[in-house]
Every structure is written in C-alpha cells, then in structure tokens.
Amino acid sequence: MCLMLLLLLNLEATVKAAVLIPQSSVCPNAEANNFLQNVKVNLKVINSLSSKASSRRPSDYLNRSTSPWTLSRNEDPDRYPSVIWEAQCRHQRCVNAEGKLDHHMNSVLIQQEILVLKREPEKCPFTFRVEKMLVGVGCTCVSSIVRHAS
C-alpha cells in the first residue's frame, strides 16, 4: 500500500513538472521508444587531494610567481559548472627578484582542456551536451625567442 502511494505521488510530481516547464518542439519526445524518463547524474566532486596539499592557498602562487596572473570569473548559467575562474597573465614579460620586468623572458599562459555540460537547446531545460573548453590555469616564464636577421 505504501509503495503504491509513493508511486502515485511520484507520478503526480512528474505530471506537474511537465506542465510547469514549457517544452519546445525540438525537445526529445517523452513518448518516443527508448526515451529515458528519469536520469540522475551525481555531479558531486570528490576531493582526492591530501589535506596538506589542499591547505595551500592557490592565491599565493598567482602573486609570488615570476609570471604573475589574475583570475577572472567566467559565468554561464547554461553551463555546468556555471562559474569557472580563468587565469590571465598580468604582463607580457616576467618579473625578476627586484620586481622589475625582465625583457629576456616572456610570460605565457598555461591552458588546460576541461569538460563541461552545456544546456542544449536552450528551450529544453534538462538536455545537456558534453563540451570541451580550454581554460587558462596559470602563467609561466619562458625564454624569449631571438631571431637574427640574415
């Protein structure tokens, strides 16, 4: 009896949700064969870093580096994660021990390719696709390339 009541409540909640959320004609058809009615995705990220490594403050590196960078907020409500912090090098050149720019060294962005979930199409509220995204994660110093005219 209890199981039957739970099933009826679940069905009622599903019907109400379908009524509240307008669907576009390009959204997947719920009546189509093999259409999944409910998909649960656990987006919880398990932090596998040791407590010693995770206790370091990343902001220390962006300021103490010989190739310092700033972090900018990249926000997209149609993406998961919706907020991604991206690094941008502060200078084209590197900073020496005295805090002056070293014209023999270049500051370059370190990039990492990540996977994000992107809502598609925007009129289908629960349809996502996996997308690759190139994100700046920090900056480093490299030797300048010197080309001699011949």
From Swiss-Prot:
The biological processes this protein is annotated with in GO are: adaptive immune response; cellular response to glucocorticoid stimulus; cellular response to interleukin-1; defense response to fungus; defense response to Gram-negative bacterium; defense response to Gram-positive bacterium; fibroblast activation; gene expression
Using the UniProt record, give the first listed, main subcellular location.
Answer: secreted
What molecular function terms (GO) are annotated for this protein? cytokine activity; protein heterodimerization activity; protein homodimerization activity
According to its UniProt record, where is this protein located?
Answer: Secreted
Cystine pairs annotated here are: 89-139, 94-141
| Keywords for the protein's UniProt record, in alphabetical order | Adaptive immunity, Cytokine, Disulfide bond, Glycoprotein, Immunity, Inflammatory response, Innate immunity, Secreted, Signal
What InterPro entries does the database record attribute to this sequence?
A: Cystine-knot_cytokine, IL-17_chr, IL-17_fam
| Residues carrying sugar | 63
Compositionally skewed regions (Polar residues) per UniProt? 62-72
Q: Membrane-spanning residues where?
A: none
Q: Which region is the signal sequence?
A: 1-17
Gene Ontology CC entries for this record: external side of plasma membrane; extracellular space
**Does Signal count among this protein's keywords?**
yes
Report the family membership: Belongs to the IL-17 family.
Function, in words: Effector cytokine of innate and adaptive immune system involved in antimicrobial host defense and maintenance of tissue integrity. Signals via IL17RA-IL17RC heterodimeric receptor complex, triggering homotypic interaction of IL17RA and IL17RC chains with TRAF3IP2 adapter. This leads to downstream TRAF6-mediated activation of NF-kappa-B and MAPkinase pathways ultimately resulting in transcriptional activation of cytokines, chemokines, antimicrobial peptides and matrix metalloproteinases, with potential strong immune inflammation.
Subunit relationships: Homodimer. Forms complexes with IL17RA and IL17RC receptors with 2:1 binding stoichiometry: two receptor chains for one interleukin molecule. IL17A homodimer preferentially drives the formation of IL17RA-IL17RC heterodimeric receptor complex. IL17A homodimer adopts an asymmetrical ternary structure with one IL17RA molecule, allowing for high affinity interactions of one IL17A monomer with one IL17RA molecule (via D1 and D2 domains), while disfavoring binding of a second IL17RA molecule on the other IL17A monomer. Heterodimer with IL17F.
This protein's name: Interleukin-17A
- The species is Rattus norvegicus (Rat)
List the top taxonomic levels of the source.
Eukaryota, Metazoa, Chordata, Craniata, Vertebrata
